């Protein structure tokens, strides 16, 4: 009886994708928790998160949801880089830093108070500080 053995490159790639997904999901949960805690602390310190452009106040759970969604987008980008790039870790860092920088434009243009804008900028950087190194580490792991 013979067993089909997958090519080692395919097995290695599948193993690395599973590892990336696992690390990414754990990092997503950590980023969601960290962002929610920082948002709650900012709210407790008096930041109202009122955005005049939309006429709404951002609810604390909204930070967790948006962080989760965009963290999963980051995992998908990292997976694509793992599959199609010869240097996925380096490409991930460049891509993620560029996307983080672009994401800072919205808080700066939202028309909120200085405290709200500062808190929103910080709340963009918190999940980036969790996700970028975690996925970089996972992409570098052999």
Give the location of each predicted region:
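Hydrophobic alpha-helical segments of small multi-pass membrane proteins
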Residues: 93-104, 120-131
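Short, Lys/Arg-rich, polar N-terminal cytosolic tail immediately upstream
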Residues: 1-18
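Alpha-helical transmembrane segments of multi-pass integral membrane proteins
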Residues: 26-27, 66-70
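Internal alpha-helical transmembrane segments of multi-pass membrane proteins
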Residues: 20, 72, 79-100
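Membrane interfacial helix motifs at helix-loop boundaries and amphipathic/re-entrant anchors
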Residues: 37-67, 105-122
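Alpha-helical transmembrane segments
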Residues: 25-35, 97-101
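Transmembrane alpha-helical segments of multi-pass membrane transport proteins and ion-pumping complexes
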Residues: 31-43, 71-79, 108, 128-133
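Membrane-water interface at the C-terminal end of transmembrane alpha helices
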Residues: 23-31, 126-142
């Amino acid at each position: 009886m013979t067993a089909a053995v997958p090519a080692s490159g395919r097995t290695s790639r599948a193993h690395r994708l599973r590892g990336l997904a696992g690390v990414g999901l754990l990092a997503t949960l950590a980023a969601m928790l960290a962002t929610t805690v920082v948002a709650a602390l900012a709210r407790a310190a008096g930041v109202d998160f009122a955005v005049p452009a939309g006429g709404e106040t951002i609810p604390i759970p909204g930070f967790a949801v948006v962080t989760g969604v965009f963290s999963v987008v980051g995992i998908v980008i990292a997976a694509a880089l793992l599959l199609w790039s010869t240097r996925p870790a380096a490409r991930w860092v460049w891509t993620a830093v560029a996307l983080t920088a672009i994401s800072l434009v919205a808080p700066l243009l939202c028309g909120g108070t200085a405290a709200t804008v500062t808190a929103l900028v910080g709340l963009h950087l918190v999940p980036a500080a969790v996700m970028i190194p975690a996925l970089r580490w996972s992409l570098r792991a052999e």
